[in-house]
Regions:
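Alpha-helical bundle regulatory/interaction domains
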Residues: 101-191
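N-terminal low-complexity or simple alpha-helical regulatory segments
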Residues: 1-132
Length: 191
């Protein structure tokens, strides 16, 4: 599977999640023996999210994922045979502030030193900066099926998009040409 961030047409299309997001949270909480109901209550979110009676926006989805990672004590959310220690993402995000260029910051964001492998890279192609996630050799945990991996790769793309937007302090939809997502099963591209 390869994911490439090159663009996104309209960031507003990413404001509401589908039923897959809720189902993923429920499955993850169950597999980790964590109460999703308690997490929703602690975060002040309506419990009707579980029954899909109220929408779940992406910000709240990522807040719930963060809380699950704390409960599980693994920022990879049980996806890797090499769990990520709590604080890993905060460490990487804090380190971005010291970078002098957006290119250097995006290269730091690639997380390679944490994942112990060359799964992410940043390339300059003509005048385009390309962030590539290549997880072909990533040490996925045995319980990670292809659908779950694809779902999480899409979330990684959204997360990286948000981080880059924060770094330049502006929506990046105007600066990016396309978002491309490929797996062995499917290919999705937004222009």
């Amino acid at each position: 599977m390869k994911c490439t961030i090159l663009s996104i047409k309209n960031t507003f299309e990413l404001t509401a999640t589908s039923a897959d997001y809720v189902k993923n949270l429920i499955a993850l909480a169950r597999s980790a023996n964590v109460s999703l109901l308690h997490i929703l209550q602690d975060l002040g979110l309506p419990i009707e999210i579980i029954e899909e009676k109220v929408p779940l926006n992406l910000v709240d989805f990522f807040r719930i994922q963060e809380r699950l990672s704390i409960e599980i004590r693994d920022e990879s959310l049980l996806m890797s045979t090499r769990p990520l220690l709590l604080g890993t993402t905060d460490h990487v995000l804090a380190s971005l502030q010291s970078k002098e260029t957006i290119t250097d910051a995006i290269k730091q964001l690639a997380y390679n030193f944490i994942h112990s492998g060359k799964y992410n890279r940043v390339e300059l192609r003509n005048t385009h900066l390309v962030y590539i996630i290549d997880d072909v050799d990533f040490p996925y945990a045995p319980q990670s099926d292809a659908q779950h991996i694809a779902f999480n790769m899409e979330n990684v793309l959204i997360f990286v998009h948000g981080i880059i937007s924060s770094l330049i302090n502006a929506p990046i939809g105007h600066f990016i040409k396309k978002v491309q997502y490929k797996t062995d099963r499917t290919s999705t591209e937004f222009e």
